Amino acid sequence: MLFRSTPSHGYLDAVDRHPWLGVCFDTCHAWAAGHDLASPGGMTATLDALVATCGPGRLALVHANDSKDPLGSTRDRHDNIGTGRIGAAAFGELFAHPALAGVPVVVETPSEGATGHAKDIATLRDLAATPVATG
């Protein structure tokens, strides 16, 4: 079973009391809740905090999406990767984080007509393949 927090609800610390729960990290939810993923090192710090709070190996799924709204807005309005307020560089940090090893990523962005999510998937693949200096 996966647990996904929503903006403005800080209950991920409960996961450590339930060993059968995993965590779904939603980038737009984290942004909406006030985690500054866009600043250099921001995604890394947020994922470090998630691992420290929930425990290693608990991250089981990522919902990847940029945000149309300002940091801390508590609004969950998805944007295409690299075109919103989070920005492409944060997703490069996401893929460089060791907690992401083997974790599936689901694209949750606005569909772009007949091509669907192809552009966002290609962008994420490029970012995942590009080395990022961390920490």
Regions picked out by a protein language model, each given a short descriptive name:
Residues F3-I81:
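Acidic/histidine-rich catalytic cores of soluble enzymes
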Residues S5, M43, G87-A88, H117:
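A structural signal for well-ordered alpha-helical scaffolds and beta->alpha junctions
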Residues H18-P19, G57, A101-V103, P131:
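Secondary-structure boundary/capping positions in well-ordered alpha/beta enzyme cores
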Residues T44-T53, R85-A99:
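A short, acidic, amphipathic alpha-helical segment used as a generic capping/interface helix at domain edges
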Residues G84-I86, I121-A122:
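Active-site loop/helix belt of alpha/beta enzymes
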Residues F95-P104, R125-T130:
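S-adenosyl-L-methionine
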Residues V106-T115:
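A short, acidic, flexible beta-alpha connecting loop/helix-capping segment that sits on the rim
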Residues A114-A133:
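C-terminal helical cap(s) of enzyme catalytic domains, especially alpha/beta-barrels
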